[in-house]
Amino acid sequence: VATINNLLQKRAINITPGFVDANTRRFNVKTSGNFQHIDELNDTVVFANANAVIRLKDIARVEFSSREASYLAYYDGKPVIFLTAEQRKHTNIFALTEAIEQEIAAFKQTLPDTIKIATLFKQSDGVESRVNGFFDNLWQGLILVGLMSLVFLGLREAIVIIIAIPLSFLIAIGWLDFSGFGLQQMSIVGLIIALGLLVDNAIVVTESIHREKHKTSNLAGASALGASKVGWAITSGTVTTMLAFLPMLMLASDTGDFVRSMPVTVVLVLLASLLIALTLTPLLASKFFSRKESKVKTLQFYVNSFAERYYVAWLSRLMRAKLLMLVSAFIALFAMASLFGQVGVSLFPKAEKSMLLIDVETPANSSLDYTNEVMHSMTDFIETQPFVEKIALNVGNSNPRIYYNEIPKRGVASYGQLLLVLKAYNEKEVNRLVAALRTEFSAWHQAKITVKEFTQGPVTDQPITVRLISESLSDLERVAADLAAKIAAIPGAINLDSPIGIANTELALAIDYDKAALSGIDINQLDSSIQTALSGTFIGQFNDSNGENYPILVRRPKSDLAGLSDITIVNQQGENVPIGQFVEIKLQKGRTDFFHYQKLRMARVSADAAKEYSVQQITTEVVSYLDNYQLPAGMYYLLGGEEESRQESFAGLSQIMLITAIGIFAILVLQFKSFLQPLVIFTSIPFAMTGAVLGLYITGLSFSMMAFIGLISLFGIVVNNAIILVDTTNKNLAENMAKKPAILLASSTRFTPILLTTITTIGGLLPLTLLGGSLWQPLGVVIISGLCVSAIASFIIVPILTELFTKTTGSEL
């Protein structure tokens, strides 16, 4: 074999010796080169003497053959080739999908009937459904806000307020497109969050103009005066709200990239709404408002009456019992805050996609054919599930990248992946299907089978991940095995993965060099001869008449384990010697797979949490186990997965929260020229935070990344009510009113706008909260519940604290 390899390699070398000049012409000289016809290979002389000529065709079979498959792919039970296309940044997925479909339709016309093209899934379908859902939430919120404005303020006032919404959106979307973000999932959510906020400015201005028009017959003057009276207050309130969102742009890591377009959108919408509230809203009010009092009493009339008759009286009594009210308020504050320990913590929820992934790991050393057989057996059961529409198999490899945070794994013969495309996404049906698949495949001993749902957020490890660090592989294997057994015993821990204990069994060829020398074996040729016998050796290229290149592989007929010792090698005397005469063939454990973490050896043990179980609770139990475990010398552990991502992301968000608070406080100090009044305004924040905890506790939702973002958003939102109240109090004091009457009058006149802005903000977020799915529900619940509790604090606690910490001139004590 070695002789044939050397002969063919020399024959296939493509060398240009040089050129020859003949008069005015120059000719390149070509002596040999790549094979161009099968006959050339067949007729190659491998041995010749005076008696005979032996050609390659006399001792070998020369033929075209397919390369041995390293992985297999199937769709609808038939072999396929999967093609995927990824979208470039700043391109439209719908236009891209349409262009691809046109190309596919044209290409289909050129195919024979034996080849079909089928679409497994289109990401644009999910995007379209999600975008339509967000726009539905937006329209529903818009309708709710409009109806609330209509019921509260009347038709003319509601029209003026509602006009501000589309104009603010159009201006902001233009700015958003100019900034390079465009409309995407997070920016649309930003529009929904901003929906309830952007009308606040228009409501406050409209309500102020509505009050002023009763004092004068000059509607234009009333509009200008009403807007000017609250101009600084709404400007300050808008800036503080923007300050709650702007620091989110500094959030590092993949999480920051994921959410970045949302704060940009909110800030741009709020800026547009402020410009409209200070300019267009007074103009429209001067044109549309009626000079005559409407005969139809709006809800604003009854709310104003309630505030003037009952609320002021109750507040006056409560202000006489300041100590009791403050103690009661802070007891309630701490009681709500204590619920945080009972609220679960998570990072990102399920993606709610109509697809499932199933990882299949057959035992080490499994052949590709065996893995293929196991996976096809799995499809027999999966096809009985009515909710499954399509099944795609990749045997010996993972699927191409089909979701933004799903990274394909390195392919091996003992690994495969199934993609299940469901008829639709229905949470109840998906949960039933996942439970059925896990129950069925958990009893299979042919392979380790993991059923996975897609998750939201950036790329992370499995939610529960422990990294064991040590330079001792034996220690890593032992501790990882103990830890894996512990995690497997924890209720709710599923999809356990601990790859370090997995090692292939290898066939080791132990050479007896003395026997090899006595047999006349050239040791240098031994490895190459065995390679040719088992895998084949590439010796050159074959070029057909069309210019296509094909590698030439020389190999022996395949041998099984029993025939391995019969492989022969030609010794120096030209005799065929079976390798079994000088080689001992034995089985041995191969190298253990392990990872590196910061250049140190690492074992990774990871798992998922079942839907009804908390990742944090399981992680806490794992940490408790490791803390009580006697780790070998030099070994330590690190937490990865959701715990690591949460610490990184929440640490960044905590810094953002601090920056937000400092920025808002600085703005308030500049506005009120006081340190104590901003502190009074800031009392709204702890009540909003504890209200958010109460909302999560009541709804049973976890404190997630989106909930944290909602909490930061509350910082800027809830202080607006207190700003308006304290600012109006200062204006009343500037008109030489006594302190308590000034506070009571401010509380009465601002009761309606505070109530209405709170209700409209809640109304704008209500569709997203109820229908936006598991990713957005915590955000909506946090803002809504925080607003409700902080509004109560604005109506009771802020007036009491304002009386305590404000002099009769409205300045700091």
Give the predicted meaning of each segment.
Residues 1-13, 32-34, 370-459, 515-536:
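Solvent-exposed, membrane-proximal periplasmic/extracellular interface segments of envelope transport
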Residues 1-143, 206, 224, 484-660, ...:
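Extracytoplasmic/periplasmic membrane-proximal domains and adjacent transmembrane bundles
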Residues 120, 127, 131, 206, ...:
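Helix-loop junctions and hydrophobic alpha-helical segments within the transmembrane domains
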Residues 143-211, 268, 666-750, 755-772, ...:
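Hydrophobic transmembrane alpha-helices and their membrane-interface caps
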Residues 177-178, 249-257, 326, 330-366, ...:
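Transmembrane helices with small-residue packing motifs
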Residues 195, 199-209, 231-250, 257-297, ...:
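Transmembrane alpha-helices and their membrane-interface boundaries in multi-pass membrane transporters
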Residues 230, 297-349, 375, 389, ...:
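Signature of alpha-helical transmembrane segments and their immediate interfacial
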Residues 262, 686, 775, 779:
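Structured binding elements
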